[in-house]
Amino acid sequence: MGMDVISVIRTKRDRGELSGEQIDWVIDAYTRGEVADEQMSSLAMAILLNGMNRGEIARWTAAMIASGERMEFSSLSRPTADKHSTGGVGDKITLPLAPLVAACGAAVPQLSGRGLGHTGGTLDKLESIPGWRALLSNEEMLNVLDTTGAVICAAGDGLAPADKKLYALRDVTGTVEAIPLIASSIMSKKIAEGTGSLVLDVKVGSGAFMKTIEDARELASTMVGLGTDHGVKTVALLTDMATPLGLTAGNALEVRESVEVLAGGGPSDVVELTLALAREMLAAAGLPDADPAKALADGSAMDVWRRMIAAQGGDPDAALPTSKEQHVVKAASSGVLTRLDAYDVGVAAWRLGAGRARKEDPVQAAAGVELHAKPGDTVTAGQPLLTLHTDTPDRFEYALAAIDGSYDVAPTGTDFTASPVVLERIA
């Protein structure tokens, strides 16, 4: 029997359940260009409004995986472990985490993305290192992984091509927030990537795509279920993104902070989350006795970082770019900093040039925001709260508009408890 896209759209519009055949057909036809963008956006909106059950999401994910190639890491002598973050502000965790987990005995094939909107992209950050290359052939990627234990690079065009098309479409049709589509997008890529185990860092709060713990929990549970159904050992941590992670949001700024963490220093929240995710990855990969804190302290994680950067053409000793212009934002009053909004800081970093509005936009390596205080810290009137960095000073005005109203200072003595970094674990 022939399929037609109108009947598929109507099924979901009328709150029906899509059959496996309908799902397989529509994903394949859309990938081949037989189903038009406007028809797929109509179906995506119906899914956003009416949802999908677990069976539909599993079949949709399987169809996206089947649209392209699957990677194979069975030739490696080490177990593979991977991490995916749903994105946040100052989220540089992949940079110290991949070499740290590799230093403890797992192989970490980290296929990463670029930034879009207020959240930064791992590849943009690493490209601020002179000479470093994000684009590797499958052969080069396996070679780096085999020799250093970790690789961070761009996903090839062959992995889940259906997702690439649908991802770009969701971005411009107001359907980014559909939990079934977020879950299948992330998991189709990760399962096609061939990893044996996966740890999900699902961000919650103003700087995340999931604003509430309930939505984050639903997304995490859906993804853990999908991973398990496809034979990938999957665990999720729900983590706080009400305020930026660490003390920097940008590209070179975050690389510098990541290197500090690998050198045994760095902000406590970045260290805490890096270690929490490392322990989960190592346990999922069958290495529960490995001690990531020791690998940070003894320099072995830093050693893997240096070798990984060099293997991808980068110079680990090169000076990172610094911005031509800075603007300091000072505290207007003395007291306790009780709020510093992650979303607003992310928008400011983006407006300074650290991010892009369209996929083809360039980014400034040195642009971003540096924090001089975090919620819970005591501040004095006139002390620096934030430093804005850019190469184009006419951007300051737009960035300052985002920062305006982004923080609260309460009277000295106000009782304030910072949110924990890790909120929940879902397995």
Role assignments for model-derived ranges:
Residues 79-102, 106-119:
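Glycine/serine-rich anion-binding loops at beta->alpha junctions
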Residues 111, 145, 153-156, 201-205, ...:
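Short beta-strand segments
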Residues 7, 12, 17-20, 30, ...:
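Well-ordered secondary-structure scaffolds
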Residues 94, 112, 119-124, 155-156, ...:
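Short acidic, glycine/serine/threonine-rich loops at helix termini
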Residues 125-151, 221-227, 231:
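A glycine-rich helix N-cap at a beta->alpha junction
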Residues 146-195:
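Phosphate/diphosphate-binding glycine-rich loops and adjacent basic-rich segments that engage nucleotide
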Residues 1-90, 307-311, 422, 426-427:
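Acidic, glycine/proline-rich low-complexity segments that act as flexible tails and inter-domain linkers
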Residues 49-50, 96-109, 189-194, 229-230, ...:
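Alpha-helix C-terminal capping segments
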